[in-house]
């Protein structure tokens, strides 16, 4: 029986490349000359720290970062940015988390979405991924389109497609 897994992962190497590209652009931009502005990736806890002298510049840095990550194949929805920026001394910063794995509430929404679609497939939650099995490949491709089309707040990848 054909099956596949629904996962939500961020390739840390691609994230590092995107952060490096963003830092390179910030260093060459005229509006950031003479300004303390940094973007750092912390591999251990999978966060990106964006720091600058004003909250407006932090927003600009986040826009640059999102654009560079998108070019590296990482969608902006996989970056969890808090609404409030932290003001410390003369700098503003924000720590954005990279979303890894699918939370249980989102998993339940996906399973409910699949069951409500009346397709002849089964969805099982396995840790931080969802295994979908069905009799026909067409049903599985319909599930892929359904999950991509559903607004669930984070990007999903499909792995281990078996026929």
UniProtKB/Swiss-Prot annotation:
Sorted keywords for this record are:
Nucleotide-binding, Virulence
Summarize the activity regulation: Activity is regulated by cyclic di-GMP, which binds to YajQ and enhances the inhibitory effect of YajQ on flagellar synthesis, allowing Salmonella to survive in the host.
Pfam families (alphabetical): DUF520 (PF04461)
**Which InterPro entries would you find in this protein's record?**
DUF520, UPF0234-like_C, UPF0234_N, YajQ-like_sf
Query: Does the UniProt entry include the keyword Oxidoreductase?
Result: no
The residues that the entry says bind 3',3'-c-di-GMP 2 are: 135-138, 163
GO cellular-component terms in the record?
cytosol
**SUPFAM superfamilies documented for this protein:** YajQ-like
Question: The organism sits in which domain of life?
Answer: Bacteria
Does Nucleotide-binding show up as a keyword for this record?
A: yes
List the effects observed when the gene is inactivated. Answer: Deletion of the gene has no effect on the growth properties in LB medium. The expression of about 40 flagellar genes, which belong to class I, class II and class III, is significantly increased in the mutant, resulting in high flagellum expression. The mutant exhibits increased motility and higher pathogenicity.
Binding of 3',3'-c-di-GMP 1, residues: 33
Q: Which GO terms describe its molecular function?
A: nucleotide binding
What is this protein's function? Cyclic di-GMP effector that influences virulence by regulating flagellar synthesis. Binds bis-(3',5')-cyclic diguanylate (cyclic di-GMP or c-di-GMP), an important bacterial second messenger that controls a wide range of cellular processes. YajQ influences Salmonella pathogenicity by inhibiting the flagellar gene transcription, thereby allowing normal expression of the flagellum. Cannot bind GMP.
Q: What is known of its domains?
A: Composed of two domains with a four-stranded antiparallel beta-sheet flanked on one side by two alpha-helices.
The family line of this record is:
Belongs to the YajQ family.
Q: What is this protein called?
A: Cyclic di-GMP-binding protein YajQ
Q: Which organism is it from?
A: Salmonella typhimurium (strain LT2 / SGSC1412 / ATCC 700720)
Gene (name only): yajQ
